[in-house]
Amino acid sequence: MKTKAVRLYGKNDLRLEEFELPQIREDEILAKVISDSICMSSYKAALQGETHKRVPNNVAENPVIIGHEFCGQIVEVGAKWQDRFHPGQKFSIQPALNQKDDPYAAPGYSFQYIGGDCQYIIIPAQVMELNCLLDYNGSAYFYGSLAEPMSCIVGGFHASYHTQQGSYVHKMGIVEGGACALLASAGPMGMGAIDYAIHGDRKPSLLVVTDIG
């Protein structure tokens, strides 16, 4: 079937094209993309092209589909996955596959037939094998697209740690009732961080937000 996509060929070389998708194999899934939010890391990949760590060196000959914050609907399921997924099912995706043999490979950077800026995609076997194709039951597709950036925000909070004098035990996340500063945080990700700080399980007593003047 034919599909349209924004494909990356190299540094500053993005092209909106129509091309033919191959027939899916028994370990693949055909899906329709409904929403895809734009990440600054996609912009970085477009600037760096094949020098980006997630973009293949042969992207000029085998272009990749850009966009990794996407949500959609399954169209056709290969035989291997028919006990887990079905046509019409809504999905979102965890693009950071973290494969042992290729840790930087990710949808939206590294694959010819899967990415968010596309009408129809072929989801490769490793996405399902690594449990990165996620069942989605939200009220709107754009919420599913925002799952990945919000997970990055939550991960950032949980990567922050505190210690007490004389102890090397790391206490992760916000200190209940403590102070929190979010720098350069009036953009989309900053707004998400503010939302999480205010509505998370542990709340700071003081939240200071700054942005670039």
Identify the function of each model-found stretch.
Residues K44-H52:
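Short Gly/aromatic-enriched secondary-structure transition segments
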Residues V6-L14:
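Extracellular beta-rich ligand/substrate-recognition surface
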Residues K2-K4:
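Extreme N-terminal starter segment of soluble prokaryotic enzymes
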Residues E176-G178, L183, I194-G213:
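Adenosine-nucleotide cofactor-binding segment
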Residues P22-D36, T51-L97, I114-G115, L134-Y136:
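Glycine-rich beta-strand-centered segment in the early N-terminal region that forms part
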Residues C152, P188-M189:
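Hydrophobic/small residue at the entry helix of a nucleotide-binding pocket
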Residues P95-A179:
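NAD(P)H dinucleotide-binding glycine-rich loop of Rossmann-like/cofactor-binding domains
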Residues W81, S160, Q164, A197-D201:
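Active-site catalytic pocket residues across diverse enzymes, especially alpha/beta-hydrolases
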